[in-house]
């Protein structure tokens, strides 16, 4: 539980008192690294690029010549989740055209384990510490990868109504939810 995690801001340290517990920075680590790489490319004078940090985090700067942006496919969650433990050939539910935007995707199909025909995803709901099951995936477009990465995880772990309300109050952020029944909801934008 988080009650066993202590932060010391003065020394920049975090202590975990339970040796069986660990912290995973997956919700923000790739976004932070992607932003740092993008800053370095800009410092070197590179203005048009796409950085793909493992399917769930992307930085799209500029646009390829004679295009409106980078075309990025959104995976169909059901095409990837297979309870036998095998990964199927991915299918795509649509594409996005991105220029000077970052994409963060969190889903229950990316990291999980299966037991007795039930799968357990890697993103936990804070109040129960059990896998969140409000939707199958959340895709976030934001000005920076850190925000896109963080927000996709945070919005995934909340009930849809609360997540939608939070998302609609975020400037320059667009969100797509994909639900278990295949339906989709998007913020205006």
Language-model features and meaning:
Residues 1-189:
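Mature catalytic core of soluble alpha/beta enzymes
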């Amino acid at each position: 539980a988080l009650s066993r995690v202590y932060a010391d801001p003065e020394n920049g340290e975090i202590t975990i008192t339970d040796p069986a517990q660990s912290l995973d920075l997956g919700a923000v680590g790739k976004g932070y690294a992607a932003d740092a790489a993008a800053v370095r490319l800009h410092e070197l004078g590179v203005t048009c690029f796409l950085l793909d940090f493992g399917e769930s985090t992307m930085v799209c700067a500029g646009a390829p010549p004679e295009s409106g942006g980078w075309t990025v496919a959104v995976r169909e969650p059901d095409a990837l989740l297979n309870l036998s433990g095998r990964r199927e050939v991915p299918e795509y539910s649509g594409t996005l055209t991105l220029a000077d935007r970052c994409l963060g995707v969190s889903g229950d199909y990316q990291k999980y384990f299966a037991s007795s025909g039930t799968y357990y995803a890697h993103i936990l709901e804070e109040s129960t510490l059990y896998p969140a099951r409000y939707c199958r995936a959340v895709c976030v477009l934001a000005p920076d990868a850190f925000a896109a990465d963080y927000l996709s995880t945070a919005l995934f772990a909340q009930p849809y109504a609360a997540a939608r309300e939070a998302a609609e109050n975020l400037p320059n952020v667009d969100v797509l939810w994909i639900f278990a029944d295949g339906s989709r909801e998007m913020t205006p934008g």
